[in-house]
Amino acid sequence: MKILLFICGEGLGHTSRCLALGKEFLAAGHEVSFGAYGYSRELVRKTGYSAWEIQPEIRLIGETGIFDIGKSIKETLRNLSPVGFRKLLKLIEVLEPDVVLSDGYYSGILAARSRKVPVYFIGHQFNMEEFFQKKGPLLAVAGKLVRRFYNYIFSSVDGIMVPDYPLPYSVNRRNFTIPRALNPNIFFSGPLIRSRYREVEAKAFRHPNVLSTIGAFGYRAAIFRKVLEAAKLDPDIHYTFIAGPGIVPEQFPEIPENVEFTGFTDNPFPYYRGSDLVITAGGHGTIMESLAFGLPVLSFPDEKHTEQENNATVLEDAGYGKRMSYLTRPEVILACIREVLEDENYRRKTRRLMELAEVLDGPAAVRKLLEEKFGERSAGKENSKEET
């Protein structure tokens, strides 16, 4: 079976789960191609795979922790071009995939449909109209147009893969609004994680160890500064900071002795395995990785980023962690860290999610689904080529 994976480059979560799928398909003897751009393409190549360059699509803009939908729309429209779309069509013609998997990359879906190739949408956010609400009449109209577009996308694909725990455990459940008629096409795969818990050797840290990740946005440096201040208040709690592509360690002077600043890593899983708690933004990918490794989460969602705020709310409501704020003071951050570390109920619930992730084995579940649907089709294509 020949699989083409298109990757949205906004946030590393899309890339990480596509790498998990690519690893699974390749191990099973299938042929995999990646289409990506920006630092997502760089990460694919650092992992050891080749990646075709595709045009950028969605671009998220924000300052000081506040998501700006207006600027994001302008940047997204600036990225799109007919030339880039024609390159997608040509890429599909050259690679001749049996199926296209498009993770948050809508142009890839349109190109696959145009070439009559089966295509699946991978995503966790299904209520984008919320981003446009209460922001004036023009953005309200834009939101309705966006809703019509993504409803068309959801109804035109061969299936929708949700890289989350099935209900009632799903973290994205507040972002999940799809017409009931599409239910037969929806598949909750479980977390798509590159490394399974039992396969990872833990980093050797002093405990308790708090792992802080910043993702891909430089403006989230505010989280680091607040957490650094919290770290100074209790030297008995140890911290490991993993920076994103937009952050350099030199931005943070006077790092206390109980803090290790590692810079960016393309393999965070030993850090998860060796830690007791994760501090992150509200991105779905990092939250899934944390929960799949049994870790409670303190989530700092970007303000006005509805999807992230919903994720963080579910974390708190379900007892998997706490929803934080960029306004939270260091003293309160420390109080929340202590509460989550000391209250066994948090760890008990997230440990259950770790066990569930192992049972679900998201990448294998997706592979088996596609093998059942397209395995025979792929074999038929090869036989046809040999006969000609």
From Swiss-Prot:
Top EC class for this record: transferase
EC number(s) on file: 2.4.-.-
Key words of the record: Glycosyltransferase, Transferase
GO molecular function: glycosyltransferase activity; hexosyltransferase activity
InterPro entries, A to Z: Glyco_trans_28_C
Keyword Transmembrane helix recorded: no
Family indicated by similarity: Belongs to the glycosyltransferase 28 family.
Identification of the protein by name: Uncharacterized glycosyltransferase MA_0453
